[in-house]
Amino acid sequence: MAHRPRWTLSQVAELFEKPLLDLLFEAQQVHRQHFDPRQVQVSTLLSIKTGACPEDCKYCPQSSRYKTGLEAERLMEVEQVLESARKAKAAGSTRFCMGAAWKNPNERDMPYLEQMVQGVKDLGLEACMTLGTLSESQAQRLANAGLDYYNHNLDTSPEFYGNIITTRTYQERLDTLEKVRDAGIKVCSGGIVGLGETVKDRAGLLLQLANLPTPPESVPINMLVKVKGTPLADNDDVDAFDFIRTIAVARIMMPTSYVRLSAGREQMNEQTQAMCFMAGANSIFYGCKLLTTPNPEEDKDLQLFRKLGLNPQQTAVLAGDNEQQQRLEQALMTPDTDEYYNAAAL
């Protein structure tokens, strides 16, 4: 592997200080060198075990420490999960992500998790999980089951992290990413904008991600979804341009990674989302629920794709199976579908 120079904090700070339009121009140039600028990878996320999490992440409604009105649910049955995966595939998703509100998986649950991964793979979808910290053996078992991606976010900079979470150390998160990588699973890791962090903290987060031995293949950038009952419910709103700037810097620093618009997208208007795509975002979560917070309605996403001339990406594992790609393309082009957008009619 060719030597990859490490980023410094001062270099990242310079990117954040660039005039926004110059930054967007640079990010779009980088993006076009490595990706088709009209393609967006589409994922669906399902909460397979909701609530009653023992951790104290101040942004999260799934923590048992906060009264958010969220009802705790046990681990879903394997067939329930696979039925959701079938629906996701029919709706056009190419990756199915399964999330559980745990500090770490219990050994007794591993056989069920392995069956979920195998079942999702059998459907021709990429499989992703986010289950908390993992042991080496758990990471290897998931890899053997066929897991493509494992999500484990760093959330924020090492310096600000202690203000948000105390029940899991930053090093534990880095250790889990290393175990996942060593097991041969691709890494999905990003963070949250709007926790009360400074621009320097945003730079610090991206610095950590970009300077990993191998940068994450997927980098979700979340906008804080403020949930009543959590300690961050009254945080200030994130300025749209600040969020777009973070997307652009992530694209420049990690040119071959997928940069995903994740939680908080329902708070963005179409113009903000369009600028995020211009800044280099090329992945979204598609569906009605993003774990326990709202996600834009599917049809609205397809309409936005149509307006911007974007296409849902077809994943390599689906060679010879074009069902969902054809469904999306047909919906975008057919006048009598809800997804159809006709600019001439406006």
UniProtKB/Swiss-Prot annotation:
Q: What detail does the entry give on cofactor binding?
A: Binds 1 [4Fe-4S] cluster. The cluster is coordinated with 3 cysteines and an exchangeable S-adenosyl-L-methionine. Binds 1 [2Fe-2S] cluster. The cluster is coordinated with 3 cysteines and 1 arginine.
Give UniProt keywords alphabetically. 2Fe-2S, 4Fe-4S, Biotin biosynthesis, Iron, Iron-sulfur, Metal-binding, S-adenosyl-L-methionine, Transferase
Q: What is this protein called?
A: Biotin synthase
So what family is this one in?
Belongs to the radical SAM superfamily. Biotin synthase family.
Q: Which organism is it from?
A: Shigella boydii serotype 18 (strain CDC 3083-94 / BS512)
Keyword Transferase present in the record's keywords: the answer is: yes
- Superkingdom: Bacteria
Keyword S-adenosyl-L-methionine on this protein? yes
Output the PROSITE patterns linked to this UniProt entry: RADICAL_SAM
Please give a single GO biological process term from the UniProt record: biotin biosynthetic process
Do you know which InterPro entries this protein is assigned to? Aldolase_TIM, BATS_dom, Biotin_synth/BioAB, Biotin_synthase, Elp3/MiaA/NifB-like_rSAM, rSAM
The entry marks the following residues as binding [2Fe-2S] cluster, namely: 97, 128, 188, 260
User: Taking every annotated instance into account, which residue ranges of this chain make up the domain Radical SAM core?
Assistant: 38-256
The positions annotated for binding [4Fe-4S] cluster are 53, 57, 60
- Give the reaction(s) catalysed: (4R,5S)-dethiobiotin + (sulfur carrier)-SH + 2 reduced [2Fe-2S]-[ferredoxin] + 2 S-adenosyl-L-methionine = (sulfur carrier)-H + biotin + 2 5'-deoxyadenosine + 2 L-methionine + 2 oxidized [2Fe-2S]-[ferredoxin]
- According to the record, the signal peptide region is none
Q: SMART domains, per this entry?
A: BATS, Elp3
Q: What does this protein do?
A: Catalyzes the conversion of dethiobiotin (DTB) to biotin by the insertion of a sulfur atom into dethiobiotin via a radical-based mechanism.
